[in-house]
Structure formats: C-alpha cells, structure tokens
C-alpha cells in the first residue's frame, strides 16, 4: 500500500491538531464545575460521561495525521487509567500543555532530545515534591473525602467508605446495576463462591429456599462421589456427633446423592452437597483456600487419600454456612490465623508476578475471600443513561480510593502541582535546551488549576497567581469561590493519581516532540472493485 509522508514542522503541526481536538473534548469535564460529554453508540442510548479515558477511547479522527496525534494522547489516558484508575482528564490536559509549549520551542530551533532531558529532570523533581506533601489515608473520613471528590458526590463518598470499612483494604468491592432506583450497599461477609446445593431437597428454610448449617463439619475433596459406600464411615460419625455436614466435591451423583436426600427428609442427619468452585488448577487452589480458612484438609486423588479413611480431624469447621440455589457462603472459618495470613501473602506475591489481567483479577478475588469479604455497590437510577453515567463515576471513585490507600493523598484541585513549581523552577542546567525542558514543565504544572477555573467561568491566571502566593496546601475552592486549605476542607487527590498523570503525560509528550517525520497509509481508491454491481462486473449492473 502506498504511503504519505510529512516532515518536521508540517508533521508536528498536523499531529498537534489531533492532540488538541482530543484534549479539548476531554478537558471540559475537569473539576467540580466540569461538564459532561455525550458519546454516540451504535446500539442503545448515547452515553453521557465525564470520564476522560472513556471519552478518549471513543475518538477516531478522519484525517490520518491528526488521528496519529490523537492516538498518542489517548495512550496517556489509557496508561494512567491502568495504573491509577483515575486522573485521566488531568493526564490528557498535561500532555497537551507540554506538547504545546514544547513545539513552540522546537519551532524556534531548540533541540527536542535535550528538551526531553529537561522534561525528565523536572518531572522527577515535581514527583518528589508531590510525594513530600502526601499524607497517609487514615480511616473512613479520608476515604469518603477521596471518593466524594472523584465522583463529585458526597453520598457516593460515604457509600464507598462504608464498603471499605466492612471488607477492609484487601476486600473486593464490585459495582453492579440495581433493579431499583436507589443505590445501596450489599456486603457478603466470609468466603462466598458461586456454587449452590445439588438438590433443592437439601434446604433447611423452605420459605427462603436456602440451607443454613450452624457449626458444621466440612468435607473438602476434588473427587467425584458416586456411591454412598465412599462416605458411609464419615456419615456414621456425623450421626454419632449429632453434627451437620457440608460436602464440597467435584460432584455428588447417583446413589450417593439419593441417600443423602432421603436421610435429610427422614431427619436422620442434615447434609448439604455442593460442587467445588472454579475449574482445573484454579479449582485446586480454591479448595486449598477453603481448607486453610476452615482448618481442614483437601482429600485429593493426587495425595492418595481415600474418602473411607477420612477422620473428623481432616474436616474443616466454621461458625455457619449458608447455601442457596447459586451460592455458598462460609462465615467465620475456624482456620489458624497465621496460616491464613501466610496464604494471603502467597497470593499477594502471585499477583505481583502475574502479567495476565484475567489471572490478576481471579487472584484478587481469592485474596478478598480469604482476607476481608466482598461488597457489592448496587447502582440505581431513573433511566439507563443516568445509570451508566453514575456507575462510571462510582467505578472511578473506587479506583481513586484504592490509589489513595496505596500511596496516600495530597491537596486536590491541581494545588499539588502549583506547590511543586517553586522547587522545579530552581533547577538549572548549563545546557540551554535542557533548561527549556525544565521551563516547559514549570509552565505545564499550572494547567490543571487554569482549566478547573476556566470550567467554572473564572480567569485562571488570577487564580494561579493567588495560589502561588498562598501557603503551601492552600488552593482555590471552586464551589465556594474561596482560597482554603485543601486537605482540611476535604479537597484531596490520591498521590498515585497526581503522580501518574504527570509522569505518563510527560513520557508521551516528550516522545512526541522528537518526531521528525510521520508516515500514514494512502487510502486505496479502487477498494470498491470486485463488488457485485461495481464497475467492471459486466452484466451485473441491474442487481438489487
């Protein structure tokens, strides 16, 4: 395929136009008075959102050189979202500012490779300053602040703080769509897995159609149980003890299942059977998790253990187990605290090592089930359009909260960037173009405050000067139109988000400045040839 090539100034100018188109669309959403963007969808209703990365992902420009510029800045938003889960609008805005200032200097004759060095030095210093003013997130109030700022909604802040308080920092919090109009929090304490009873006759509460076993023994095996002879010795022990039994096995079928059901209906003993969760190697790991949580042992083919030889010491114990048609929840397993902690550390190490997003997600779920529990935020709204928008804001707020717990929080509203300017501007270099790179970052650090002010209809330059001349940590509160201590007034941003946005923006922007040629495909005008009814297909002109 033939290519079109543009060089130096022409290439950079065209690509910058693409950068501006994308960034100008995204940056209208920044700050508490930022607006939304409507995205057309091929199916269903349009999507209304203020999430930078969602908007950026939708943008494809017709002009190929402009599109290249837009795609480069899209990467800034995507990478920031992957690392921190929020701050994508800020990252896009910073990238645009660095590219704009950088290109002015490159056009004036500065060397882009040396500018790049200066940008790196300045960004490292700015990140150091951002980390200095960071403080750890302590308790529910701080978490609620971070979430409320991210979602621009105090109710959402409280909801996420409640969820994190209940399941802990390691717990999993998922966001789902609710069938009702209200938004509520549903917490599953203990370990839950998605397998229900094998027979409806096993229920103990016919009204709720669930089985509740108090202080049961738990048999954990990866074998298939087909004949009752396999577990008869164990069942006899259960009858003697007068205890209830939960069987977690690959499957319980045929005669074995029938016998368990008949004895339950006769009232001889209560036993509920469920299939083991997961598949393949993941199933083995999950069974081992359950064993550690309940202080039991996995009766496995691989270890040569026979079900007939199982003693009471091999069985797990728990305060209670609840089983419905689809899920099993083990509450307060009697496992040794140290063993559980060791297992948690092992899973954390695996999360660090794995590169697959899917594996990481599954390991995170296992970690949550062992260490905290699972909370589900059910989002409700009057219309589907509002529901989607609200769900996105909650997901962003959740990511911001986790980032805050990880690396702490600092003053919000772009104040952390402005506070870093004095130290960054002190940096010097004997090489003039390196100093140019430092100056570019010094100027770009003002941009978030400028845009937040602009979106609120206020002159950004005036605000920036006042923030610069105020005490560190004092910034502009858009909602009250006052200059306040940001952290004391609950206007906070996670340090990880602030840092990642700047680092990713600088990385892509500095590379952009070094562009000297751009190559794109020339669309093939003869693409239509060979289609039915197309020119050259003799005798087919009249086809419908």
From Swiss-Prot:
Signal peptide: none annotated. It catalyses: ATP + H2O + a folded polypeptide = ADP + phosphate + an unfolded polypeptide. The keyword Chaperone applies. Coiled coil: none annotated. GO terms for cellular component: cytoplasm. It is found in: Cytoplasm. GO terms for biological process: protein refolding. Its EC number is 5.6.1.7. Together with its co-chaperonin GroES, plays an essential role in assisting protein folding. The GroEL-GroES system forms a nano-cage that allows encapsulation of the non-native substrate proteins and provides a physical environment optimized to promote and accelerate protein folding. NCBIfam families: GroEL (TIGR02348), PRK00013.1 (NF000592), PRK12849.1 (NF009487), PRK12850.1 (NF009488), PRK12851.1 (NF009489). Forms a cylinder of 14 subunits composed of two heptameric rings stacked back-to-back. Interacts with the co-chaperonin GroES. Belongs to the chaperonin (HSP60) family. This is Chaperonin GroEL. It comes from Clostridium kluyveri (strain ATCC 8527 / DSM 555 / NBRC 12016 / NCIMB 10680 / K1).
């Amino acid at each position: 395929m033939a290519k079109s090539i543009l060089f130096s100034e022409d290439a950079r100018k065209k690509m910058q136009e693409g950068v501006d188109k994308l960034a100008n669309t995204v940056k209208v959403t920044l700050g508490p008075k930022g607006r939304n963007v409507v995205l057309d969808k091929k199916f269903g209703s349009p999507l209304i959102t203020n999430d930078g990365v969602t908007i950026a992902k939708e943008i494809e420009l017709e002009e190929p050189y402009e599109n290249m510029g837009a795609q480069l800045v899209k990467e800034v938003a995507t990478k920031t979202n992957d690392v921190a889960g929020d701050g994508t609008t800020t990252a896009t805005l910073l990238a645009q500012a660095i590219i704009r200032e950088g290109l002015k200097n490159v056009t004036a004759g500065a060397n882009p490779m040396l500018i790049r060095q200066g940008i790196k030095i300045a960004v490292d210093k700015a990140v150091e300053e951002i980390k200095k003013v960071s403080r750890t997130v302590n308790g529910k109030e701080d978490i609620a602040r971070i979430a409320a700022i991210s979602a621009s909604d105090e109710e959402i802040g409280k909801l996420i703080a409640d969820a994190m308080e209940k399941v802990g920092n390691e717990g999993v919090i998922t966001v789902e769509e609710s069938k009702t109009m209200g938004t509520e929090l549903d917490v599953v304490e203990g370990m839950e897995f998605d397998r229900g009873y094998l027979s409806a006759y096993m229920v103990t509460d016919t009204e709720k159609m669930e089985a509740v076993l108090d202080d049961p023994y738990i048999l954990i095996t990866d074998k298939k149980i087909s004949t009752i002879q396999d577990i008869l010795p164990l069942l006899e022990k259960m009858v003697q003890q007068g205890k209830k039994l939960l069987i977690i096995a690959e499957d319980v079928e045929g005669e074995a299942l029938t016998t368990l059901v008949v004895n339950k209906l006769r009232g001889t003993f209560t036993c509920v059977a469920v299939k083991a969760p997961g598949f393949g190697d993941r199933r083995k790991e999950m069974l081992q998790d359950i064993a550690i949580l309940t202080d039991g042992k996995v009766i496995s083919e691989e270890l040569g253990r026979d079900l007939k030889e199982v003693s009471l010491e091999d069985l797990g114990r728990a305060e209670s187990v609840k089983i419905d048609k689809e899920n099993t929840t083990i509450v307060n397993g009697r496992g040794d605290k140290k063993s559980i902690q060791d297992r948690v550390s092992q899973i954390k190490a695996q999360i660090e090592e794995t590169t697959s997003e899917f594996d990481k997600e599954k390991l995170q779920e296992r970690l949550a089930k062992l260490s905290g529990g699972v909370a589900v935020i059910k989002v409700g709204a009057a219309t589907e359009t509002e529901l989607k928008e609200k769900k996105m804001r909650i997901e962003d707020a959740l990511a911001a909260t986790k980032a805050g717990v990880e690396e702490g929080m600092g003053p919000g509203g772009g104040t952390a960037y402005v506070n870093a300017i004095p130290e960054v501007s002190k940096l010097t270099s004997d090489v003039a173009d390196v100093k140019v790179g430092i100056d570019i970052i010094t100027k770009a650090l003002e941009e978030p405050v400028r845009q937040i002010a602009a979106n609120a209809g206020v002159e950004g330059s005036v605000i920036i000067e006042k923030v610069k001349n105020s005490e560190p940590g004092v910034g502009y509160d858009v909602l009250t139109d006052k200059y306040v201590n940001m952290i004391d007034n609950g206007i906070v941003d996670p340090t990880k988000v602030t840092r990642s946005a700047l680092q990713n923006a600088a990385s892509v922007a500095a590379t952009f400045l070094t562009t000297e040629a751009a190559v794109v495909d020339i669309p093939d005008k003869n693409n239509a040839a060979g289609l039915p009814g197309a020119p050259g297909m003799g005798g087919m002109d009249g086809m419908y």
